[in-house]
C-alpha cells in the first residue's frame, strides 16, 4: 500500500507563499531547500499518519507536525491517506487561521 496525501487549496497556497517569501529573503536555493524540507514532512506524515501529535483541542480529528518554522495541520481521511489542511508559520494564530 502506498502512502498518499491531498493538499487543500489553502495548503497549496500556503506552500506557494512560503516559497515566495523565502525566495525574496534568501534566494532560490534556500526557497527550494525549504520546500523540500516541508515536502519531506508531508511525505513522512503520509507514510505514517499517526506521526503527528493529535490536536483535537484545536479541531477534532486534526493532527500537527512541525517542519522547520512551520506546522502542518492534517487529518487522516482513510487507510494510508491524509488531507493536509494548512501549513502555518509558528507565529500565526492557529485558531484564526484554521
Swiss-Prot record:
The keyword DNA repair does not apply. Toxic component of a type II toxin-antitoxin (TA) system. Upon expression in E.coli inhibits cell growth and colony formation. Its toxic effect is neutralized by coexpression with cognate antitoxin ParD1. It comes from the Bacteria. This is Toxin ParE1. One of its GO terms (biological process) is symbiont-mediated perturbation of host process. The keyword Electron transport does not apply. Keywords: Toxin-antitoxin system. Belongs to the RelE toxin family. InterPro entries: ParE1/4, RelE/ParE_toxin, RelE/ParE_toxin_dom_sf, TA_system_RelE-like_toxin. The gene is parE1.
Amino acid at each position: 500500500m502506498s502512502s498518499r496525501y491531498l493538499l487543500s487549496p489553502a495548503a497549496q497556497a500556503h506552500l506557494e507563499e512560503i516559497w515566495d517569501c523565502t525566495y525574496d529573503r534568501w534566494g532560490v536555493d534556500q526557497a527550494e531547500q525549504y520546500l523540500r524540507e516541508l515536502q519531506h514532512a508531508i511525505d513522512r506524515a503520509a507514510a505514517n499518519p499517526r506521526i503527528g501529535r493529535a490536536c483535537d483541542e484545536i479541531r477534532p480529528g486534526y493532527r500537527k507536525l512541525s517542519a522547520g518554522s512551520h506546522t502542518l495541520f492534517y487529518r487522516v481521511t482513510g487507510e494510508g491517506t491524509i488531507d493536509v489542511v494548512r501549513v502555518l508559520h509558528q507565529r500565526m494564530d492557529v485558531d484564526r487561521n484554521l
